[in-house]
Structure formats: C-alpha cells, structure tokens
C-alpha cells in the first residue's frame, strides 16, 4: 500500500511566506532542541478554542510533520503549522521574548481583532 503525503515547506528567505518565524524564536528553539538532545524536534504552533477571547495559541514540540502541514525554516529550525491553524495565523509572526513577566513564545497576529491582556488568546 502506498501513501502519499503533501507537506508544504516555506523558507524564511522567501518573499511571500504565510507566517514569519523570528530569529529570536529560532534561536530559542535551537537552544531547547540542543538541551533535549533530539535534532528531530520541531516547534508546532496551533490554534484551539478557548481563552478569554475565543481562540488561544498553543506551542509544543513535535517530531513529525503531518499531511497538509506547512513548515517554515529559519536558521535550520523548523516551525510547523496545521492547515486549520494557518488560516488564523496568515501574515503573523511567531516570536520569542524574555522580560519581567517571564520568557515565552508568542504570536504577533494581524488577524486578531481583540486580544486578552496576556496575549495568549484572541478573536477574529
């Protein structure tokens, strides 16, 4: 039995990428992957229902890329997004920050009409 999978890979240097992956986020992911000693890990960003504003962002590490996923590569690090989540993230940027409130990955999302105070949830 033969299975075909369709995976769309986008390189950050391309002009019309659907979602950006910042250098700060890529650098932090590189560090975390090195700590885990698993070079197959990729950062997956996804959207779920919930949070203060209706939808919320989620981040996890994943070893596999599923059929239909979009992958975005920056500095040898891969960001993975499923097709349903990508529609809410188009034109956005996955970034990483460290500050007084702690360290976190976040999404700068131009599609969000409202966001909660912590930035973890949004509505469209």
Swiss-Prot record:
The keyword Cell membrane is annotated on this UniProt entry: no
Gene3D superfamilies, per the entry: HesB-like domain
Positions with a binding annotation for iron-sulfur cluster: 52, 116, 118
One CC-aspect GO term: cytosol
Alphabetically ordered keywords of this record: Iron, Iron-sulfur, Metal-binding
Function: Required for insertion of 4Fe-4S clusters for at least IspG.
Subunit: Homodimer.
Domain of life: Bacteria
Record protein name field: Iron-sulfur cluster insertion protein ErpA
GO biological process per UniProt: iron-sulfur cluster assembly
Gene Ontology MF terms in the entry: 2 iron, 2 sulfur cluster binding; 4 iron, 4 sulfur cluster binding; iron ion binding
Cofactors, names only: iron-sulfur cluster
Family: Belongs to the HesB/IscA family.
InterPro entries cross-referenced by the UniProt entry: FeS_biogenesis, FeS_cluster_insertion, FeS_cluster_insertion_CS, FeS_cluster_insertion_RrpA, HesB-like_dom_sf
Cofactor note: Binds 1 iron-sulfur cluster per subunit.
